[in-house]
Amino acid sequence: IMKILLTNDDGYDAKNIKTLYEKLSENHEVWIIAPKNNCSGMSAAISYLNEIEVTKIDEKIYAVDGTPADCSYLGLLSIVDFEFDIVVSGINHGANIGNDVLYSGTVGAAIGGRNLKYPPIAISVASYDAKDIDYIANKSCEIINKIFNSKQTLKGKVININFPDISEE
């Protein structure tokens, strides 16, 4: 069982993060620590000049009035009193490929995890309204499990996974 910090840049109540949370929670301990509002395009920016408010929404769900990277840092350093095994950012509404990764808050949140020496995975789907988000979430879980169970070091790396808008059919 992994302890997973799940974040994104689309907001804690976005459909895709909720779906991934449900699927990952079937076999793992998962906490959503994600932006209060949509923060797409924030890259790995941090809120060093602003006070950041954290709101507990549910037992394992926190909304952060800050950037996606703020969510990773706060989740890993102060919100909980244990260590996570991995940081997962996504599932992003829209692909993060090519130059998009330079601006992506989804990738930025994963970079925050990497900067604190945690294995990070960013996940995106090439659609703002995926045909079958349950299928994408299930495939994401399979990949996350394989990467984590491989015991290969992700030190200094960010895994960036992009799915086409596909369904199980």
PLM regions and their residue ranges:
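A cross-family phosphate/adenosyl-ligand binding-site feature
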Residues: 4, 15-78, 82-83
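Short, glycine-rich nucleotide/cofactor-binding loops
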Residues: 6-13, 100-101
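Short, Asp-centered acidic motifs that coordinate Mg2+ and/or phosphate
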Residues: 86
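Glycine/threonine-rich flexible loop motifs
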Residues: 95-104
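Hydrophobic/aromatic ligand-binding patch that stacks against planar heteroaromatic rings
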Residues: 109-113
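Glycine-rich phosphate/pyrophosphate-binding loops
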Residues: 114-136
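Electrostatically charged, flexible surface regions
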Residues: 135-169
